[in-house]
Amino acid sequence: GKPYKGGREGRMLWNCVDVRDVARAHRLCMETTVGGNGSRYILSAADRGGELFTWQLQALLESLYPMVDDIGGEPMHGEGGDVPVKPTYDAPRAYCLLAKQELGLETFDLETTVRDTVDSYYAVGLLGDETS
């Protein structure tokens, strides 16, 4: 892939949400007896484990897809190329705790979300052939 050029030179905090969790939360909102008309829920990462800085997302993608030559992302340095060149702003954090508590939302873990997302991109040809 190409290096990500958005944000602060590719550096950002990713609050990862699985679209399947969003769909499930919508269904649970319709079925709940706890929430009422006008109830609001933040559908974001379940906890800190669902938040990654760009360099952490790069490392996860590299571990899941070692056959990809260049994952892209923010510039790295250090002995193993595992230290960001510049620090990333640690953005304010929000989680879907209320949706988990009131609706009983059970979220997909981050690795499953990332793997299933990338695998779906390969399946529809957005990333070419997974073996190349």
Model segments located where?
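Alpha-helical substrate-binding/gating segment
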Residues: 1-41
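Conserved C-terminal active-site "lid" loop/helix of NAD(P)H-dependent oxidoreductases
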Residues: 19, 79-104
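Mid/C-terminal beta-alpha module of Rossmann-like enzyme folds, strongest
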Residues: 24-82, 116, 125-132
